[in-house]
From Swiss-Prot:
EC number: 1.-.-.-
Protein species of origin: Hypomyces subiculosus
Residue ranges annotated for the FAD-binding PCMH-type domain, each copy included: 152-337
PROSITE patterns, per the entry: FAD_PCMH (PS51387)
Disordered as annotated region, ranges: 34-53
Gene Ontology MF annotations: FAD binding; oxidoreductase activity
Protein's recorded name: FAD-linked oxidoreductase hmp9
Signal peptide stretch: 1-29
Length: 628
């Protein structure tokens, strides 16, 4: 079933979800901590020694349920009255499937049926479009499934339906007063579980929506003229998804750089971590689109970050990932629509299926060498391939390669001319592989997007993955490329999925001159990204999960790093367990971001795994978040 879903998603050129079957970007995946003066008594109460971090005294660990410092039911009830009854005591989505007072087979059947629906997941504060770890799986009793165990796991125990800025600030204040871990979630679309936290209070932004407004000519909120941008802009005031922003863009006949999937949040984690999509090669990554942002800091104050004020925070938001504050509002660039988008579709399947399918992998290596030149010519898009799949992948084949790549603003003739040398290079495989291709041209960007990408994908499954930015030197030698392809293709029983994302080059390279960019510099020299992933069953023991995770980190991830040793990975679709995540996700800019983190969040309130400053904390076996 995994392969069928993946084939459908990436066949339709789904961006990140497509290939990975993973998660939901948290606009802002970050927990919070507290003011030193407020937290010192809690540190002493817990018996831990207060830490002195500059001007900050704070307890070493956050409170968790069951401890003496955990708020009583009366305190939670009082807080709920303070915020107008918007506090939610969370419970697992599938708890109705398990023995106990909440068991309800009718509700369980509904949950099982809707589990893969993205709105079903997003409409719950503990819903995750691509959960990092499922600890209460739905049970299909009609299919003969039987319940195992059910718990919240790393999901929050309380959530605030934060529809106003005041309620966001009240939530942060309560968390600081009580030394609680906080997570911030808008869509729950995050691939690394950065929106999760054991025993946390969640600031749920799903309904924090005010307005999406089009500006024919961008005007900075404070009159700042340093951006140099004189084109159009879209003002996104609230935790909207890309599908909402796309409606406004299409109505005004402009292009915005959004996700290939429509479900991620348009502000916060997706752009701050990089943010790629069908238009990013031509117009820049999501991080490059941000013209300004309004951010709530840990003390509840709201600041404007742009080219004129809070410029260090502005830079961090444009590539440094989540964890600096709660992003409430952004303005992004918008571009004139185009008259044509030409798409090339290619499928390759073995004529004779074998366990290793070596001929297919030979062809994949040829294509990997061809991508930089195709990207130079203007091609962008997504490809994916599998050595083996448990079920049918392309037609009746259980292995194969498929891509949809396109040229924005160019004709079919130009697209054919560019791909012709690659097709010729593939001809040597025609006795062993079935190779099919076709072209399609659309008369504007949005006709292309709605047909080739941006569809409503199935969700709710878990994978682990690793990613690598691929520069030109990495693919100069065929034998080195083929060696890497062999490893990431995995053993026949791995059923690994590999995705090639031609989302860089073009304007992404040109934006290297932007001094306000906070992206890993490796983006500016790498035409494409490779992602290697493996699926994990909904119900699995930890030993089996660890075996898959270790394979991704120490086998497939290591092979990609060997292939491209001087680049890095894409933080929004990377390996949470990567021991070198600081170097791989941030590169040489990390010290700058860490200084910004310490300036705006000296208490580490907005902690999230693999985010800036995460190395200063650890999660204990009891689930506590503690300073090292």
């Amino acid at each position: 079933m995994f392969c069928i879903i993946r084939a459908q998603l990436l066949l339709l050129l789904h961006l990140l979800v497509l290939a990975l079957l993973l998660v939901g970007t948290v606009c802002n995946a970050h927990p919070q901590h507290g003011h030193p003066s407020e937290l010192e008594p809690l540190a002493l109460k817990r018996g831990g020694s207060p830490r002195d971090d500059g001007n900050t005294l704070a307890p070493r660990c956050r409170c968790i349920p069951g401890e003496a410092c955990w708020p009583s039911t009366q305190i939670w009830d009082s807080f709920n009255r303070t915020i107008g009854g918007s506090l939610i005591k969370t419970a697992p989505l599938a708890e109705s499937c398990y023995p106990g007072p909440k068991k309800n087979t009718r509700k369980c059947a509904v949950v099982s049926r809707k589990w893969t629906d993205q709105d079903f997941q997003t409409d719950s504060p503990v819903g995750r479009t691509y959960p990092y770890n499922i600890t209460c799986a739905p049970v299909n009793y009609f299919a003969g499934q039987r319940p195992t165990t059910c718990s919240l796991g790393q999901l929050p125990v309380y959530a605030i339906d934060a529809r106003t800025r005041q309620s966001v600030a009240q939530g942060l204040r309560f968390a600081k007063d009580n030394n609680l871990r906080v997570t911030v979630v808008s869509t729950g679309h995050d691939l690394l579980g950065r929106a999760d936290g054991y025993g946390s209070l969640e600031i749920w932004l799903r309904h924090h929506r005010n307005e999406i407004r089009f500006e024919r000519q961008y005007m900075a909120t404070d009159g700042c003229r340093e951006s140099g941008w004189t084109g159009s802009a879209i003002d996104i005031d609230g935790a909207y998804q890309w599908r909402d922003v796309h409606i406004k863009a299409r109505a005004n006949n402009v292009i915005v750089v959004g996700g290939g999937s429509v479900s991620p949040g348009a502000i916060g984690g997706w752009p701050s971590g990089g943010g790629h999509g069908p238009a990013s090669r031509n117009y820049g990554l999501g991080a490059d689109q941000i013209l300004e942002a309004e951010v709530m800091l840990a003390d509840g104050s709201v600041v404007l970050a742009n080219h004129c004020q809070h410029t260090d925070l502005f830079r961090a938001l444009r590539g440094g990932g989540p964890g600096f504050g709660v992003v409430l509002k952004t303005k992004i660039k918008a571009y004139p629509n185009v008259a044509s988008v030409s798409v090339h579709h290619l499928t390759i399947t073995p004529i004779r299926q074998t366990p290793n399918n070596s001929d297919l992998l030979d062809a994949v290596a040829v294509l990997m060498q061809a991508y930089p030149k195709l990207s130079d010519d203007g091609y962008a898009g997504y490809a994916f391939w599998l050595r083996n799949c448990k079920s049918f992948f392309i037609g009746s084949a259980k292995s194969g390669y498929r891509h949809g790549i396109w040229m924005i603003g160019k004709t079919t003739e130009e697209a054919e001319h560019s791909f012709a040398p690659v097709r010729e290079a593939l001809d040597k495989f025609k006795s062993k592989l079935t190779i099919s291709e076709s072209y399609m041209t659309y008369n504007d960007y949005w006709s292309f997007y709605t047909s080739e990408s941006g569809l409503y994908e199935s969700v709710g499954t878990t994978s682990v993955l690793t990613s690598r930015l691929i520069d030109r030197p990495a693919v100069e030698d065929y034998n080195r490329v083929r060696e890497a392809v062999e490893v990431i293709g995995g053993k026949p029983e791995d059923y690994a999925t590999n995705v090639m994302m031609l989302v860089s080059n073009g304007q992404v390279f040109a934006d290297a001159a932007d001094k306000s960019s906070g992206l890993n510099p490796a983006w500016r020299v790498s035409p494409y990204v490779v992602i290697s992933s493996r699926g994990i069953p909904m119900v699995v023991d930890q030993a089996s999960r660890k075996e898959v995770a270790d394979d991704i980190t120490y086998v497939k991830g290591a092979a990609l790093q060997k292939l491209a040793p001087n680049t890095g990975g894409y933080m929004n679709e990377g390996d949470r367990n990567d021991p070198n995540y600081i170097k791989n996700f941030f590169g040489t800019i990390y010290p700058t971001h860490l200084a910004t983190k310490k300036k705006y969040d000296p208490w580490g309130l907005f902690y999230c795994p693999t985010c800036v400053g995460a190395e200063l904390f650890e999660e204990t076996s009891r689930g506590e978040l503690c300073r090292r």
